[in-house]
């Protein structure tokens, strides 16, 4: 049902549509949706539409009327009221002067029955050298987090939505494993953040802070596209490749003074991590 909603978000989605795609009755499909996601399909669809529309208002030269119409809202007034309830600001004001807002980032519910052999065949890992410029990163620290799940337990899983609302230098938020000199407290290695220009002077959300990162060289490791339910295997595949790879082969050594970077695992592009290196 989530996949169907994502693929048909700009269209009218009815209970019958969700029932058909899930092969359940409309009543039971709705019940399952609420049980697993904590909200009705209608609320889920509205929140997702509002968040998608906010990104359009931030990034495109588009009117509030056009966005409201294209996202299927019955009237501009109705859209404006819904936008204000969701984000606490008027859509016109937001499009003129974007500020960080808590975008809706829904949890993806994966079927419990998985085939552990789905990714057992030989798969390629692509590696390339990239240069990242000097930049600031707006981050939200944890306490003892060392990976995604412990981070979510400490600070919540909604941070990503807020970071997504901030226009990023790299086009999307990032997760970082910080080197020791950037940790505070020292036990918190893993953080989420968004890379921005060195002269960024926009709003810093409450509870967030800014760190400065120098221009640096990275090895980008990217796996092949994967089915969403196989995301754990996709991540492990890249971690194994990183452990086995010797950057000295191309004249580099690992750099422990810059953070390792994790991009959002998206099946259609493959899992991606960036590991810092330096010239030998």
Whereabouts are the PLM-identified features?
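Residue-level detection of beta-strand scaffold positions
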Residues: 1, 30, 37, 46-48, ...
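Short, charged N-terminal helix-start/capping segments
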Residues: 1-9, 66, 150-155, 207-209
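Terminal helix-turn-helix DNA-binding modules in bacterial transcription factors
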Residues: 3-16, 34-71, 98-118
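Sequence-specific DNA-binding recognition helix
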Residues: 13-33, 59-95
């Amino acid at each position: 049902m989530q996949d169907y909603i994502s693929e048909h978000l700009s269209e009218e989605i009815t209970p019958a549509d969700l029932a058909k795609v899930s092969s359940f009755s409309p009543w039971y499909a709705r019940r399952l949706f609420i049980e697993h996601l904590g909200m009705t399909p209608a609320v889920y669809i509205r929140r997702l539409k509002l968040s998608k529309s906010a990104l359009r208002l931030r990034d495109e030269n588009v009117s509030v009327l056009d966005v409201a119409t294209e996202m299927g809202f019955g009237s501009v007034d109705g859209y404006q009221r819904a936008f204000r309830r969701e984000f606490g600001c008027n859509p016109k004001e937001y499009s003129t002067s974007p500020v960080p807002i808590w975008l809706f980032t829904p949890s993806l519910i994966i079927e419990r029955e998985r085939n552990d052999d789905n990714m057992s065949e030989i798969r390629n890992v692509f590696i390339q050298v990239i240069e990242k410029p000097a930049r600031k990163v707006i981050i939200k620290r944890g306490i003892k987090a060392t990976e995604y799940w412990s981070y979510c337990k400490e600070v919540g899983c909604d941070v990503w939505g807020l970071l997504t609302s901030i226009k990023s230098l790299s086009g999307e938020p990032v997760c970082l494993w910080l080197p020791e000199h950037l940790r505070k407290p020292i036990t918190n290695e893993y953080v989420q953040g968004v890379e921005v220009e060195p002269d960024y002077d926009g709003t810093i959300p409450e509870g967030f802070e800014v760190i400065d990162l120098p221009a640096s060289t990275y090895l980008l490791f990217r796996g092949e596209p994967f089915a969403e339910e196989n995301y754990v295997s996709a991540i492990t595949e890249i971690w194994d490749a990183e452990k086995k790879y010797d950057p000295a082969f191309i004249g580099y050594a690992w750099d422990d003074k810059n953070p390792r970077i994790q991009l959002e695992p998206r099946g259609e592009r493959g899992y991606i991590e960036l590991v810092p290196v330096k010239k030998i």
